[in-house]
């Protein structure tokens, strides 16, 4: 049996095209762990999330509690959380949260890029298509208890 994991690397210039393609094709589950959230990034992604919810895709977003966000961004975070909650997205707040990852069905994205806020920083993300990698990550992070 071949246990080789096939993965691909992306940077801040190539990530969103690939990620949004995966996101649009989600069938049953999306988990996004992003400690930071901005209105600019949410405006790009919210229409896709809305379509996924209309197809009954289970979406979970894990971020920091409101009081851990910088005051300059707090209003944007409150707005974005409200938009997502109105869509029926499950929002989790984890104190001290700093993980940057996503699960889209059997695809795991992990790295340094804040998916819901990235703007002009130099980042890297790895895409792994593997049910086992998804299972391992959701178990390791404790997200499996929300599934």
Per-range role (PLM):
Residues 1-13, 31-37:
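Acidic/glycine-enriched edge-of-secondary-structure segments
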Residues 7, 109-147:
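Signature of lipid phosphatidyltransferase scaffolds
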Residues 12, 41-42, 91:
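A conditional alpha-helix N-cap/helix-loop micro-motif detector
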Residues 19-85:
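Primarily the HKD phosphodiesterase
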Residues 60, 89-94:
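General small-molecule cofactor/ligand-binding pocket signal
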Residues 99-102:
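Short acidic loop-to-beta-strand element that houses the catalytic metal-binding Asp/Glu
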Residues 105-106:
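Glycine-centered positions within short beta-strands or beta-hairpins
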């Amino acid at each position: 049996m071949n246990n080789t994991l096939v993965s691909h690397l992306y940077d801040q210039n190539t990530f969103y095209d690939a990620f949004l393609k995966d996101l649009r094709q989600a069938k049953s589950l999306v988990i996004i762990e992003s400690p930071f959230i901005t209105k600019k990034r949410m405006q790009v992604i919210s229409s896709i999330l809305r379509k996924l919810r209309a197809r009954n895709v289970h979406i979970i977003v894990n971020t920091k509690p409101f009081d851990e966000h910088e005051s300059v961004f707090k209003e944007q975070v409150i707005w974005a959380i409200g938009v997502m909650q109105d869509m029926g997205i499950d929002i989790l707040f984890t104190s001290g949260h700093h993980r940057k990852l996503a699960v889209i069905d059997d695809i795991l994205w992990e790295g340094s890029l804040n998916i819901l806020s990235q703007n002009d920083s130099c980042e890297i993300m790895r895409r792994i298509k593997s049910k086992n990698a998804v299972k391992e990550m959701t178990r390791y992070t404790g997200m499996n208890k929300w599934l």
